[in-house]
Amino acid sequence: LKDRRVRRALALTIDRESLTENILKGGQIPAYAMTPPDTKGYFPPNKLEFNPAEAKKLMALAGYPDGKNFPETEILYNTNEGHRKVAVAIQQMWKIHLNIDIRLTNQEWKVYLDSESNGDYEISRAGWIGDYVDPNNFLDMFICGGGNNRTGWCNEDYDKLILQEAPKKKSDQNRFAIFLEAEEILIDEMPVIPIYTYTSKNLVHSSLKNLNPNILNQASYKDLFLSDDLE
């Protein structure tokens, strides 16, 4: 997994559309980059579409033609039936398309967090929900030594873009150009593999008005009101 060609091959052999439609079934959105699309008007690069043929070439270049001599590798996930189903599906995809063997390990939440924090894993399932609406909230996770960077990955060029260049820009348009350049590095190096973007389902009574959906799923309660005109 120290070889980025292997990491990219793994990313290219996850069929995200099949995963979201047939396994998750909750309206989740296939993710082809680290940042959700249209986060404050930012659109990330889209370079991770399902491509088993390219993945096989990358594995061969890395010294593992048709999966030969590739060591059995582990996927760690916290105990949850949904996470188990996703892990099993990815395990099967990698076996079918790359002919590699994957071992699944589940741990209770606190044990799992310790394993991830200590780097005691090979591949680990993880998730992130943004605290505020800005692509920086997803991209600054992967700076060298960052508290949320549990990958062991460190890239000085990436850090410079996120920590030095982007903050200098006064407009979102110029900041987003820097973020796009940084995310290109992230996708090329592939320390993490984006799979899908969370969605939320809400039951809303027809009398509730002025509920404006937003990416954080946070209602502005001062703007809500009830109407007697039921639809």
Model-derived regions, located:
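Detector for C-terminal structural segments
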Residues: 9-43, 81-91, 113-231
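Short, well-ordered beta-strand elements
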Residues: 70-79, 103-105
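DNA breakage-rejoining catalytic core of tyrosine-based enzymes
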Residues: 44-52
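Short helix-loop capping/hinge motifs at secondary-structure junctions, enriched
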Residues: 1-6, 48, 66, 167-170
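Generic alpha-helical secondary structure
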Residues: 3, 52, 83-87
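Short alpha-helix C-terminal cap/hinge motif
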Residues: 90-104
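Immediate post-signal peptide segment of exported/extracytoplasmic ligand-binding proteins
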Residues: 4, 52-74
